[in-house]
Amino acid sequence: MYETRWTTNEEITIMADYWYRMASEMEETDGIPKPELHRVEEVKHLFVKESNLGNLMFRVAIDSNDNIVACAGGLIRTEYSYPLAEEQSLFGWVIAVYTLKNHRNNGLAYKLVDEICLWLKQKGAKRARLWSSSTGRRVYEDLGFKNMMDMSKPLS
């Protein structure tokens, strides 16, 4: 019923819309502040830039009518892998994982994230990270993602 594939260059900007939908739902479920609409344009430009540099790729699931119904992105970054690490290493970030509501519970997020992790590994990343909503946590745990020692405190 579904197929997965890489996005085309023309579809990269559509991924910013899916990112906005994901972020909006995180506001509803987890209280994460909903991004302002102007942020979508900034994210579009960022996605195009990083895609053109070869640092960002998206996998999408399409339905039988060739409509994009789910996506997941992979972003390569150089970062310190842990506090006080002497050298930076390649890290993969899984970003903008989103499935349209009427296509959920079909394993699409799992499949797309798994495919993105393979791409990140092929690009040289030693570890993949992501920020998860409470509703998506189980999918990522099933893929082998673990909680890290990150803590936060609102200061306002």
Residue ranges and their predicted role:
Residues 45-60, 93:
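A short helix-loop-beta-strand connector motif used in the catalytic cores of GNAT acetyltransferases and
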Residues 60, 67-76, 93, 98:
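Conserved beta-strand in the GNAT
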